[in-house]
């Protein structure tokens, strides 16, 4: 049907001898030119190809055409009609109904009389739109009186029926002020019906200020208050239910007059007698005998400001003017892309409104009940007769402070007297707990002094050991006693090693793995009288202080270089714990039994000192908590909130005999 130069069908058998170059090239279209470098569309009857520019059809418009026939074929055979593609229905049974429903002259699907969408619109509308919708929704129930129409009016009705098949997205020109508007006014009847403005969402129409001024239905457009004293929905006639025998001719004549005077429909409606604009009663399908064609003309938006439909040419009506169609489709696509973002904006706007209402409620509490001041309770302040503020029991802060002061003066003396008369068991328990904490603190301080003494003794032993002389005979005896065939495995890396160098290897392997982990705190350690505890080296990247023991930190300290003539100096022991008073006099580089013995002894003493300091800190925290509880127990707030009831006034001491 459609295509460009590559989609052209081969010429007939009679043209095989013709060359495509020069004068013998095949010619196409009504212009009879051989040009094939532009968009072309082919007739599905005569297989003739036409240029889109010559017949005013663009490539985008051709995508919506299913079957296209040229004008000559349509004049020869009136049964040939251009058919268009339609979107699939979103309902589950849309595909089943599409094949069974009849199609109209333009190839579109006809709306049945019982279409639920039509019934919904007819049920929710008001005025003439609701009357016409109800009348056309059930033509089999009513017997409408035929209207006398001239041939020109009959042709006009056919045009309006074709206009009704145009998609609703084509009701936007994209140029007027209403089409360019992006926000709803929030004041018209359509906006008040929306959920985001607190409505029931029954009408489901766009804001009246956003209805296109050229293509929208006249009943949906915005009518300024200066032109009409009533709203657009109220301007349309709302007749009462007429009797079935007498009012039917008048009803059809009235609608016939509206049909003839389409251009001035609103002015004629305003001049209706008072009976036509009275309060309407519920209408049924049997009550109204209306012309379905009149309803189609009304829904298609045929009543514009000039009394003429916005599409007058019957051949251009199915696919619109190319420029206007392009703008309308562009606006539609932009709206589809912004659909999700608009939903998010609406949700965000709802949350913002809720938060704003909550803030206004607390910032301006007097606004909540300003309409009904008599419903506010009286202020509870002493001697105050004013109304309390919304959300409060008092009219001002002064009244609340006065009442609180009176309560203290009235209740506190009696509570103090009760506290002094009966001893408090919790107070006595607190005193006992304080005594126990103080004893533990004293023992911890004694332990800390002992560890300080051991610290200084160790430093003296290390200093005296360094003064010993090296003996070579002990080195030879050690080498002879070692077993070279025995192997053990490292506890850190698992490699097999010789027992002679096991301690040296394990110490270095441990330092390598330990340096991969950091232990830090945000604050340095400050302990009075304590030396050489934590490393406390600041790390600028993590902004922490290292909390390893200073003598064992492999990350920020290294073992000093040992000279060749330095003695080992490790104190020798008997039966593991009993000191002999002698020292190891092997060279420090060659002694494998006492590798880094100074560092390990210092770490042992420092670790014990740290434990004692932690114990002291815990005891200080317990003492502070107990003292705080004892202070608050007899305070103003505690006495006002808590009370011990003595059921026997003669017995003031409530303790048991065991606790006394």
Swiss-Prot record:
Null mutant phenotype reads:
Cxxc1 knockout male mice are fertile. In contrast Cxxc1 germ cell-specific knockout female mice are sterile.
Where primarily located? Answer: nucleus
Q: What is this protein called?
A: CXXC-type zinc finger protein 1
- Where Phosphothreonine occurs, the residues are 231
User: One cellular component GO annotation, for this chain's record?
Assistant: nuclear matrix
Question: What species is given as this protein's source?
Answer: Mus musculus (Mouse)
Q: Which residues bind Zn(2+) 2?
A: 185, 188, 191, 207
User: Can you tell me where the transmembrane regions are?
Assistant: none
In this UniProt entry, the residues modified to Phosphoserine are 6, 19, 124, 228
Coiled-coil stretches: 426-479
């Amino acid at each position: 049907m459609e295509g460009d130069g590559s989609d052209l069908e081969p010429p007939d058998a009679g043209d095989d001898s013709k060359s495509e170059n020069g004068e013998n090239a095949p010619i196409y279209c009504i212009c009879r030119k051989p040009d094939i470098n532009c968009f072309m569309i082919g007739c599905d009857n005569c297989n003739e190809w036409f240029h889109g520019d010559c017949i005013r059809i663009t490539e985008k418009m051709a995508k919506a055409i299913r079957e296209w026939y040229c004008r000559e074929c349509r004049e020869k055979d009136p049964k040939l009609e251009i058919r268009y593609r339609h979107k699939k229905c979103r309902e589950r049974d849309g595909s089943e109904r599409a094949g069974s429903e009849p199609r109209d002259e333009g190839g579109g699907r006809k709306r049945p009389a019982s279409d639920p969408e039509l019934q919904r619109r007819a049920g929710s509308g008001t005025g003439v739109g609701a009357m016409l919708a109800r009348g056309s929704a059930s033509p089999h129930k009513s017997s409408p009186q035929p209207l006398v129409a001239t041939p020109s009016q009959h042709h006009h009705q056919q045009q309006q029926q074709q206009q009704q098949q145009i998609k609703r997205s084509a009701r936007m020109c994209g140029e007027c002020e209403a089409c360019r508007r992006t926000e709803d006014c929030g004041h018209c009847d359509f906006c008040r019906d929306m959920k985001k403005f607190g409505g029931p969402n029954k009408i489901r129409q766009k804001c009246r200020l956003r209805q296109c001024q050229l293509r929208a239905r006249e009943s949906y457009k915005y009518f300024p208050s200066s032109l009409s004293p009533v709203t657009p929905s109220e301007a349309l006639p709302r007749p009462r239910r007429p009797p079935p025998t007498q009012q039917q001719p008048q009803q059809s004549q009235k609608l016939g007059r509206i049909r003839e005077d389409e251009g001035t429909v609103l002015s004629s409606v305003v001049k209706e007698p008072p009976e036509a604009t009275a309060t309407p009663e519920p209408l049924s399908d049997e009550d109204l005998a209306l012309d379905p064609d009149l309803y189609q003309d009304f829904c298609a938006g045929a009543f514009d400001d000039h009394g003429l439909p916005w599409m007058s040419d019957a051949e251009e009506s199915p696919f619109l003017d190319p420029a206007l169609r392009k703008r309308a489709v562009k606006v539609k696509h932009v709206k589809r892309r912004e659909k999700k973002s608009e939903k998010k904006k609406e949700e965000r706007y709802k949350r913002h409104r809720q938060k704003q209402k909550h803030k206004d409620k607390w910032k301006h509490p007097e606004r909540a009940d300003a309409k009904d001041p008599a419903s506010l309770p009286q202020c509870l302040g002493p001697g105050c007769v004013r109304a309390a503020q919304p959300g409060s029991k008092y009219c001002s802060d002064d009244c609340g402070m006065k009442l609180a002061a009176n309560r203290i003066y009235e209740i506190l003396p009696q509570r103090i007297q009760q506290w002094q008369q009966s001893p408090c068991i919790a107070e006595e328990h607190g005193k006992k707990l304080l005594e126990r904490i103080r004893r533990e603190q004293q023992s911890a301080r004694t332990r800390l002094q002992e560890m300080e003494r051991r610290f200084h003794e160790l430093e003296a032993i290390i200093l005296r050991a360094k003064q010993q002389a090296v003996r070579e005979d002990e080195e030879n005896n050690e080498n002879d006693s070692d077993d070279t065939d025995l192997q053990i495995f490292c506890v850190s890396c698992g490699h097999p090693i010789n027992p002679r160098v096991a301690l040296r290897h394990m110490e270095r392997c441990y330092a390598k793995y330990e340096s991969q982990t950091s232990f830090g705190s945000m604050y340095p350690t400050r302990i009075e009288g304590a030396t050489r505890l934590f490393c406390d080296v600041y790390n600028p990247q993590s902004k922490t202080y290292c909390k390893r023991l200073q003598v064992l930190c492999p990350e920020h300290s290294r073992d000093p270089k040992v000279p060749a003539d330095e003695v080992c100096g490790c104190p020798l022991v008997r039966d593991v714990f009993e000191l002999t008073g002698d020292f190891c006099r092997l060279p420090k580089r060659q002694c494998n039994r006492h590798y880094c013995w100074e560092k390990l002894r210092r770490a042992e003493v420092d670790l014990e000192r740290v434990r004692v300091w932690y114990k002291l800190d815990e005891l200080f925290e317990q003492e502070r908590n107990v003292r705080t509880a004892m202070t608050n127990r007899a305070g103003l707030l505690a006495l006002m909130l808590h009370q011990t009831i003595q059921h026997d006034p003669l017995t003031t001491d409530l303790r048991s005999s065991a606790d006394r």
